[in-house]
Every structure is written in structure tokens, then in C-alpha cells.
């Protein structure tokens, strides 16, 4: 892998992260926000893999597994919150959380 390949992949990783953050901020549905957060987490994961491949270092793969584990935990907690919010309010609007009492 050359330096220009690494730059291209890092630009792609930054783009994935930016699209994910925009999706989290722009969408009101909690399920869409969870999907956008997964897209945002895939950007740094791609960056770790690319940097590890460029430097011939396996630590990039280790960081990828860490990001993958964190993403799985985030999905589990997020889906549990989504189901609870949907049961309590009847909607998946994340703004409905502010109306909950107690």
C-alpha cells in the first residue's frame, strides 16, 4: 500500500464518519440514529485497518476488533432503549424521551 492509497482510504473513512454524524444529528427516529451511529463507527474502524496495513502492524486489526465490540454493545443497548421507548410512548421519536417522567 502506498501513501496515496492511505490518503484515499483515510478520506473515505473521514467521509463515512461525517455522514454518520450528520445522520445522527439530522434524523429524529431513534432507529435511524442507531444505524447512522453504526456508519459513523465504521469510519474510524476503516482508518485503523488502513493504518495498520500501511505500517504492516497488526495493532490496526486489534483496534478494529475493539471498535467492532463497542459497536455491538452500542447496538444491544440502543435496541433495548428503542424497544422501551416505543413501548412507553408509542413512537420512535428520540425527542419523546424528554417528555418521560420518573
From Swiss-Prot:
Main subcellular location: membrane
Domain of life: Bacteria
Alphabetized UniProt keyword annotations: Cell inner membrane, Cell membrane, Membrane, NAD, Quinone, Translocase, Transmembrane, Transmembrane helix, Transport, Ubiquinone
A single GO molecular function term of this UniProt record: quinone binding
Reaction it catalyzes: a quinone + NADH + 5 H(+)(in) = a quinol + NAD(+) + 4 H(+)(out)
Cellular compartment(s): Cell inner membrane
Species in which this protein is naturally found: Rhodopseudomonas palustris (strain TIE-1)
Membrane-crossing segments per the record: 6-26, 30-50, 63-83
Family annotation (InterPro entries): NADH_UbQ_OxRdtase_chain4L/K (IPR001133), NUOK/Mnh_C1-like (IPR039428)
Protein name per its UniProtKB record: NADH-quinone oxidoreductase subunit K
Purpose of the protein: NDH-1 shuttles electrons from NADH, via FMN and iron-sulfur (Fe-S) centers, to quinones in the respiratory chain. The immediate electron acceptor for the enzyme in this species is believed to be ubiquinone. Couples the redox reaction to proton translocation (for every two electrons transferred, four hydrogen ions are translocated across the cytoplasmic membrane), and thus conserves the redox energy in a proton gradient.
Similarity section: Belongs to the complex I subunit 4L family.
The keyword Flavoprotein is assigned to this record: no
GO CC field: NADH dehydrogenase complex; plasma membrane
Gene Ontology BP annotations: ATP synthesis coupled electron transport
Amino acid at each position: 500500500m502506498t501513501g496515496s492509497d492511505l490518503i484515499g482510504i483515510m478520506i473515505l473513512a473521514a467521509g463515512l464518519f461525517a455522514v454518520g454524524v450528520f445522520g445522527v444529528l439530522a434524523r429524529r427516529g431513534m432507529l435511524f440514529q442507531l444505524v447512522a451511529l453504526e456508519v459513523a463507527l465504521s469510519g474510524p474502524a476503516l482508518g485503523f485497518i488502513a493504518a495498520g496495513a500501511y505500517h504492516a502492524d497488526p495493532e490496526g486489526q486489534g483496534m478494529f476488533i475493539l471498535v467492532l465490540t463497542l459497536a455491538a454493545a452500542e447496538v444491544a443497548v440502543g435496541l433495548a432503549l428503542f424497544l422501551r421507548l416505543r413501548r412507553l410512548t408509542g413512537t420512535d421519536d428520540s425527542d419523546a424521551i424528554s417528555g418521560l417522567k420518573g
